[in-house]
From Swiss-Prot:
Gene3D superfamilies xref list: Nucleic acid-binding proteins
Protein name (database record): Translation initiation factor IF-1
Described function: One of the essential components for the initiation of protein synthesis. Stabilizes the binding of IF-2 and IF-3 on the 30S subunit to which N-formylmethionyl-tRNA(fMet) subsequently binds. Helps modulate mRNA selection, yielding the 30S pre-initiation complex (PIC). Upon addition of the 50S ribosomal subunit IF-1, IF-2 and IF-3 are released leaving the mature 70S translation initiation complex.
Name of the coding gene: infA
Protein biosynthesis recorded as keyword: yes
Gene Ontology terms, MF aspect: ribosome binding; rRNA binding; translation initiation factor activity
Organism: Christiangramia forsetii (strain DSM 17595 / CGMCC 1.15422 / KT0803) (Gramella forsetii)
Xref: HAMAP family: IF_1
């Protein structure tokens, strides 16, 4: 069985949690918990509440996401 593709969404960071986790509100109003991708960690990209970001979500668990880009 092939792995399903990730779902890409845009959102806004609401709150910074511990361990580089963030609470993000999607454009459709849903709130998810997201962590920073490895490349963003490697390049020391800082995120603050209010930043617009691009997220990747697994089709299996729509409450968790990975932040892949900051606008």
């Amino acid at each position: 069985m092939a792995k399903q593709a990730a779902i890409e969404q845009d959102g806004t960071i609401i709150e910074a949690l511990s361990n580089a986790m963030f609470r993000v509100e999607l454009e459709n109003g849903h709130v998810v918990t997201a962590h920073i991708s490895g490349k963003m960690r490697m390049h020391y990209i800082k995120l603050l509440p209010g930043d617009k970001v691009k997220l990747e979500m697994s089709p299996y668990d729509l409450t968790k996401a990975r932040i892949t880009y900051r606008y």
